[in-house]
Amino acid sequence: MDMGLTDKLAVVTGASKGIGLATVRALVGEGATVVAGSRSSSPELEELAGVHSVKVDLSTPDGPERLVDAAREVGAVEVLVNNVGAVTPRLEGFLAVTEDDWLASLNLTFLAAVRTTRAALPNMLAAGRGSIVNVSSVNAFLADPVVIDYSAAKAALSNFTKALSQELGPRGIRVNSVSPGPVSTALWLGDEGVAATVAQAQGGSPDAVAEAAAGQMATGRFTTPAEVADLVVLLASERAGNVTGSDFLIDGGLVKTL
């Protein structure tokens, strides 16, 4: 199936690993040129052809603008994937989450998307076309005190997606989001990931924590980064030409409500 992405320029944030890296791979596989923004690069990212890697701190007010400026040197941005984000389990409760913790979560997980979108949008508006895909989370609507600041930031991102789609739809620009459940990335399964952090605090092993999480899903397993990336690429493509303002769960059946 031709996704109509050949020779289009895409910007992907949080691109050096996990869902971001998988999305870069998938876009390149569809013939797109990608400007990949991340705080640090990775060998896996650097080895990909058709990728312009930009080292940038997207949690800062000027980082997103610098990323988009670098993309403009390559061409006109037609696709934006706002993927960057981070989560820290707050196992000591709400009162232990400091002002700095809240600001860090909001800056990276929500405001980075706002700022990158704001920087990329003028060129899309001038062209009268474009697609923005925001990587949200099931935690946008599954309230969990263990990730309270992350959940609030993702809820803001999902609301931002819906609201912006209403403004930009008449001007040829689509805005959608995907909401993964647990994904088999370092965010969950790494040495400092969610499973390891919870295991250290509560006892047991990271593997046992991960198995318990997987057991809550109808499929009994974590989603892979490539599966999320495939959904992102579909939404970014011309195959989803009349899809906007929508959020797509990819959670293995974790969410049981209608």
Residue positions per predicted region:
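Residue(s) in the substrate-gating loop at a strand-loop-helix junction
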Residues: 137
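Short, small/polar-rich loop/turn modules that mediate ligand/substrate recognition or access, typified
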Residues: 169, 174, 243-245
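Substrate-binding pocket helix/loop in short-chain dehydrogenase/reductase
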Residues: 90-94, 98-106, 132, 213
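Short C-terminal tail/terminal secondary-structure segment
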Residues: 91, 221, 232-233, 244-258
